[in-house]
């Protein structure tokens, strides 16, 4: 396993740990989720380039499109929650009240 693979996996693990530890604000959760998606994109692009599989060459771009859609939806939910509740604390959100 090369040093690049180890660094990308370490970036994913750090983002996952950040997602688990810093859950108090919605913005920090979205940033950690974005870091996870970016490391998945990098790992998938490296894997597709290494195996020279031409049919899977669009897979990293499709993942990047889904990551952009996820970021847009997350930011719109952040704006909606901060406008209605006045804060972005995850603990203040209750599914029965929203």
UniProtKB/Swiss-Prot annotation:
Compartments it resides in: Mitochondrion inner membrane
Membrane topology: Multi-pass membrane protein
Protein's name according to its UniProt entry: NADH-ubiquinone oxidoreductase chain 4L
Source organism of this protein record: Phataginus tetradactyla
Residue ranges crossing the lipid bilayer per the database entry: 1-21, 29-49, 61-81
Gene from which this protein is expressed: MT-ND4L
Subunit-structure text: Core subunit of respiratory chain NADH dehydrogenase (Complex I) which is composed of 45 different subunits.
Major location category of this protein: mitochondrion
UniProt keyword list: Electron transport, Membrane, Mitochondrion, Mitochondrion inner membrane, NAD, Respiratory chain, Translocase, Transmembrane, Transmembrane helix, Transport, Ubiquinone
Catalytically driven reaction(s): a ubiquinone + NADH + 5 H(+)(in) = a ubiquinol + NAD(+) + 4 H(+)(out)
Organism placement in taxonomy: Eukaryota, Metazoa, Chordata, Craniata, Vertebrata
GO biological processes: ATP synthesis coupled electron transport
Main function: Core subunit of the mitochondrial membrane respiratory chain NADH dehydrogenase (Complex I) which catalyzes electron transfer from NADH through the respiratory chain, using ubiquinone as an electron acceptor. Part of the enzyme membrane arm which is embedded in the lipid bilayer and involved in proton translocation.
Keyword set includes Chloroplast: no
GO terms of molecular function: NADH dehydrogenase (ubiquinone) activity
Family membership: Belongs to the complex I subunit 4L family.
The enzyme's E.C. designation: 7.1.1.2
One GO cellular component term noted in the UniProt record for this chain: mitochondrial inner membrane
Annotated InterPro entries: NADH_UbQ_OxRdtase_chain4L/K (IPR001133), NUOK/Mnh_C1-like (IPR039428)
């Amino acid at each position: 396993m090369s040093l690049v693979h180890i660094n990308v996996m370490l970036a994913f693990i750090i983002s996952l740990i950040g997602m688990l530890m810093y859950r108090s604000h919605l913005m920090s959760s979205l940033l950690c989720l974005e870091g996870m998606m970016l490391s998945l994109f990098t790992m998938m692009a490296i894997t597709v380039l290494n195996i020279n599989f031409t049919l899977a060459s669009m897979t990293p771009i499709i993942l990047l499109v889904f990551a952009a859609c996820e970021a847009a939806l997350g930011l719109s939910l952040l704006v909606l929650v901060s406008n209605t509740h006045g804060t972005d604390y995850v603990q203040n959100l209750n599914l029965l009240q929203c």
